[in-house]
């Protein structure tokens, strides 16, 4: 892998992990389009490490409050929110563990990715247009958390988008756009930590090179910017921009995949 490729993929990870457009889809599609070889497990760890840095840098104060409240003050909003996030993490973690092999093989076909980009774009539009922006963080219930966590299990399929499906579920349950995004970002922390640690066991110090560092740095920086951008963007706007992007990108991928399939 070249440093340029690492930079491009790091930027894609930083954008796609937090914007509702699917990082896994784009990390499959870009090498497919340009004929790049699979970056390998080592670089997967680099990308997860980068996005972990970005989410930790943005939300570290909130996580300290949540953890501290869970340990010391039962019954508070922050303590409940910590355990809601733990509960919501379980379905996605279980599905990720059980279907890891399929996620790396069967699910990584451009045609399926194109279809899922469109399908989830339609669901996001429906949920965002149907529900009023009512619930804030303090109004999230245990049932809301569990349902959002269950939706996260579908993110094992590239094109669905972990952030996209959890924000869609949040909007369908009546969360405001900013609240749906914030809860999704907090929920991503244990998933990203778990995925990184699970893969980290196979990495040696010799695997850390310039491309690895470039991937970490670019995904971390772009990820931080993406989080900040989306939270501000959604205070006065809808998800329509991302819906249109998913529809257009999904259609383009399907057409291109079909053209390559039939030799055009």
Curated annotation (Swiss-Prot):
Catalyses: di-trans,octa-cis-undecaprenyl diphosphate + H2O = di-trans,octa-cis-undecaprenyl phosphate + phosphate + H(+)
Keyword terms: Antibiotic resistance, Cell membrane, Cell shape, Cell wall biogenesis/degradation, Hydrolase, Membrane, Peptidoglycan synthesis, Transmembrane, Transmembrane helix
Query: From which domain of life does this come?
Result: Bacteria
Q: Where in the cell is it found?
A: Cell membrane
- Record's InterPro entries? UppP
Instruction: Name the GO cellular-component terms.
Output: plasma membrane
Molecular function, one GO term: undecaprenyl-diphosphatase activity
A Pfam cross-reference name: BacA
Transmembrane parts of this sequence: 1-21, 40-60, 81-101, 109-129, 140-160, 183-203, 211-231, 239-259
For membrane topology, the record states:
Multi-pass membrane protein
EC primary class: hydrolase
List the EC numbers from the record: 3.6.1.27
Per the record, the GO terms for biological process are: cell wall organization; peptidoglycan biosynthetic process; regulation of cell shape; response to antibiotic
Instruction: State whether keyword Plastid applies.
Output: no
Q: Does the keyword Amino-acid biosynthesis apply?
A: no
Q: Which family does it belong to?
A: Belongs to the UppP family.
Biological role: Catalyzes the dephosphorylation of undecaprenyl diphosphate (UPP). Confers resistance to bacitracin.
Q: What else is known?
A: Bacitracin is thought to be involved in the inhibition of peptidoglycan synthesis by sequestering undecaprenyl diphosphate, thereby reducing the pool of lipid carrier available.
What name does this protein carry? Undecaprenyl-diphosphatase
Which organism is this entry from? Pelotomaculum thermopropionicum (strain DSM 13744 / JCM 10971 / SI)
Tell me what gene encodes this.
uppP
């Amino acid at each position: 892998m070249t440093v340029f490729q690492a930079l491009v993929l790091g930027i894609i990870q930083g954008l796609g992990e937090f914007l509702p457009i699917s990082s896994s889809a784009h990390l499959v599609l870009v090498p497919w389009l340009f004929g790049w070889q699979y970056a390998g497990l080592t670089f997967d760890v680099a990308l997860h490490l980068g996005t972990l840095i970005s989410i930790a840098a943005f939300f570290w104060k909130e996580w300290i409050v949540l953890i501290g409240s869970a340990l010391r003050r039962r019954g508070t909003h922050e303590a409940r929110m910590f355990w809601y996030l733990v509960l919501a993490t379980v379905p996605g973690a279980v599905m990720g563990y059980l279907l890891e092999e399929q996620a790396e093989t069967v699910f990584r076909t451009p045609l399926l990715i194109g279809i899922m980009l469109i399908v989830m774009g339609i669901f996001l539009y429906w949920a965002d247009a149907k529900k009023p922006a009512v619930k804030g963080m303090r109004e999230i219930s245990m049932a809301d958390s569990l349902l959002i966590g269950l939706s996260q299990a579908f993110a094992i399929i590239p094109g669905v988008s972990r952030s996209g499906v959890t924000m869609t579920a949040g909007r369908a349950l009546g969360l405001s756009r900013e609240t749906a995004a914030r809860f999704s970002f907090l929920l991503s922390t244990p998933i990203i930590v778990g995925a990184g640690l699970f893969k980290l066991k196979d990495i040696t110090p010799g695997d850390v090179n310039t491309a690895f560092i470039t991937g970490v740095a670019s995904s971390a920086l772009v990820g931080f910017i993406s989080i900040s951008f989306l939270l501000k963007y959604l205070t006065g706007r809808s998800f329509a921009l991302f819906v249109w992007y998913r529809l257009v990108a999904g259609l383009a991928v399907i057409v291109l995949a079909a053209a390559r399939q039939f030799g055009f």
